[in-house]
Amino acid sequence: MFGLGLADVILERFKDFMREQPEPYKFLQVFYAQEKERFLNHKMSDYIKQNKSKEEASILARQGFVSAVGRALEKIIELLLKDFCIKNNVKMTNDKILRAKRINGELDRVKRALWVHFGEYSVLPDIILYQTNKDNIKILAILSVKNSFRERFTETPYWKLKLLQSPVTSHIKVFMITPDNDDEISFKDKPKG
């Protein structure tokens, strides 16, 4: 795995995890916990070797994990959706691809259909599912992938509100995907009533 970024290393480990779990998407939190422990132990050791205090090493290691795991989660979701897309003649792309300096005409049309501007900033959704028919592009759904619900819980409804403003985009489905690592939206017990 030499030369791979951390998100790619985590993705490769998830592929191994998939071979062990028949329904790996149900065990994302288990996988996440394993990766977090592995990463924190390794990084803390590195920071302590650099003469950082244990407390500072812990803070730095956690910050590094949060930034890396977000992109890894997007790659894992893309991997889990790959077969679905192939079976249903659906194409998938993401904001990283669409931000490249050189993209083909099809991807440029996808980008132009979804790009939202906030003053000097432009925003694209994490993952986009779409279909093509000759020169026509139909965007089916956007996926907002968040490692933590707390992270940007307002972003997903914002996308839907923006899309509803135009008859051209009002049909697009919007989904938020999160392992809910902070237990912000999970219900451990069934509600009484």
UniProtKB/Swiss-Prot annotation:
InterPro entries: RE_BsaWI. GO terms for biological process: DNA restriction-modification system. The keyword Nuclease applies. One of its GO terms (molecular function) is endonuclease activity. Pfam families: RE_BsaWI. Signal peptide: none annotated. Transmembrane segments: none annotated. Keywords: Endonuclease, Hydrolase, Nuclease, Restriction system. It catalyses: Endonucleolytic cleavage of DNA to give specific double-stranded fragments with terminal 5'-phosphates. It is an enzyme of class 3 (hydrolase). Its EC number is 3.1.21.4. The keyword Kinase does not apply. A P subtype probable restriction enzyme that recognizes the double-stranded sequence CCGG; the cleavage site is unknown. Belongs to the BsaWI type II restriction endonuclease family. This is Probable type II restriction enzyme HpyAORF263P. It comes from Helicobacter pylori (strain ATCC 700392 / 26695).
